[in-house]
Amino acid sequence: MGGEADSRQPLTAEGVAVAVNVRCSNGTKFSVTTSLDSTVESFKELIAQNSDVPANQQRLIYKGRILKDDQTLLSYGLQADHTVHMVRGFVPSSPSAPAANAGNQTTAPQAVGSNDSSNLGGGESLFPGLGFNPLGGGNAMAGLFGSGLPDLEQAQQQLAQNPNMIREMMNTPAIQNLMNNPEFMRSMIMNNPQMRELVDRNPELGHVLNDPSILRQTLEAARNPELMREMMRNTDRAMSNIESMPEGFNMLRRMYENVQEPLMNATTMSENAGNNTSSNPFAALLGNQGVTTQGSDTSNNISAPNAETGTPNANPLPNPWGATAGQTTAPGRTNAGLGGLGGLGGLGGLGMLGADSPLGATPDASQLSQILQNPAMSQMMQSVLSNPQYMNQLMSLNPQLRSMLDMNPQLREMMQNPDFLRQFSSPEMMQQMMSLQQSLFSQNRNTAGQDPTQTGAATGTANNGGLDLLMNMFGSLGAGGLSGTNQPNVPPEERFATQLQQLQEMGFYDRAENIRALLATNGNVNAAVERLLGSIGQ
């Protein structure tokens, strides 16, 4: 055995510890000291001590091959200072784990028909500038439980009264998965044409988006209100110190011209959208400060300094995380954000699920199939559906669903059964329901396209209330908006340049196959690796 090891690796004797580099899918890299004759399983345990990925969820790839647990590192030709790529794999959760987690919670599960939804809330996005809403406010929950969410003003008050709720929502497996995958967030952010144009005009913002630590710190600040307040205090103190330094005022002026002013201009440069903030990624972040509406009362701004007088501004800077006083919102306003992130409410990572679809658009079953094949998506859905308390809070937000459950106790018991929810959300059941929904969409579109002058057309249109209600309830299947995301007109080679480089470093050299896998997984490197490895085994 020793001779064989010497013949395969002359410079390393059997049992001698060597350093092996491990590169994660989020770009981080670290070294692990191990023996080459050790098994892959023991090597994964060493990696788990240096990362947040458990050993049973690790997928190690070396030269395009996935390492099996019962094999040794030397059997794959691994040598000292070589690099092994690690991605997070999908592991089915045990049925006892969710029950144990539910039993450790101090709050008792509320009834489905209860009107008290303060523990969950439905406020505006924690990341309003990106359209990312893990709390399910606005249209984000339309793809999960239809429309009919509580008023956003009331939800904001609930958030203010219960700051721990934000922390609980950010601790969900869905949000944690996003925090551990900055590349996914960066790709979703860059899918927005306005955001991409802003980055092109301001390369400094591009450097921020290309730094995984900054994205991770931003998510951590949103998860921890105390940390966010501390960061805001430190920023104010730093700006005050910079202003007191020589040339500090000019430095702040340049920072305003290069950073803050482009962000303010981003709220007004929507020429085609007018004052509609739904297409603006920074409108909610800046509180519509750059949007002016005709007939607005300017008496509320009597203390604002005149820019032409040259007098310094003695008023405090506006709080981007606070509500804007006296702000008027258009009746048809929707949440600003990326189309691809519209379904992140509730299930926190459903990608295209819940995205606003054009009127009468027919959902695409192939997109649903691609989403259900995503291992991360399956894991997140299982974690959510296995928690009866979380499902009760979600269902209590929809008045129609709540009233229907009150009238049917048997249905309420079924919706509280985790096994039934898992079977109901299986890929086969979802595809069958999608087929039925497509037929309903076709019938609704044909009915709406009838000439009102024809005999019986008006009567048929007036009697479609039941069909509209049924289609609205189909939103509870998570298929309320499978119209496709706002894909930019950019070649996939440019869109997935970073992901293609990572796949090539892992040993996948077929560029065309890599592009097809990335297109099918919407740029998810982990899912693309799973897809490529599955195609190799076929």
UniProtKB/Swiss-Prot annotation:
It is found in: Nucleus; Cytoplasm. One of its GO terms (molecular function) is polyubiquitin modification-dependent protein binding. PROSITE patterns: UBA (PS50030), UBIQUITIN_2 (PS50053). Residues 491-535 form the UBA domain. Residues 138-179, 192-231, 357-394, 398-433 form the STI1 domain. Its main location: nucleus. Disulfide bonds: none annotated. InterPro entries: STI1_HS-bd (IPR006636), UBA (IPR015940), UBA-like_sf (IPR009060), Ubiquilin (IPR015496), Ubiquitin-like_dom (IPR000626), Ubiquitin-like_domsf (IPR029071). Ubiquitous with a strong expression level in inflorescence. Residues 102-119 have a biased composition (Polar residues). CDD domains: UBA_PLICs (cd14399), Ubl_Dsk2p_like (cd16106). Keywords: Cytoplasm, Nucleus, Repeat. It holds the Pfam family ubiquitin. Residues 18-93 form the Ubiquitin-like domain. GO terms for cellular component: cytosol; mitochondrion; nucleus. Residues 95-120, 289-316 are annotated as: Disordered. Interacts with 'Lys-48'-linked polyubiquitin chains via its UBA domain. Interacts with RPN10 and RPN13. Interacts with PEX2 and PEX12. Binds and presumably selects ubiquitin-conjugates for destruction. Prefers multiubiquitin chains rather than single ubiquitins, with a binding affinity for 'Lys-48'-linked ubiquitin chains. Acts as a ubiquitin receptor that associates with the 26S proteasomal docking subunit RPN10 for the indirect recognition of ubiquitinated substrates of ubiquitin/26S proteasome-mediated proteolysis (UPP). This is Ubiquitin domain-containing protein DSK2a. It comes from Arabidopsis thaliana (Mouse-ear cress). The gene is DSK2A.
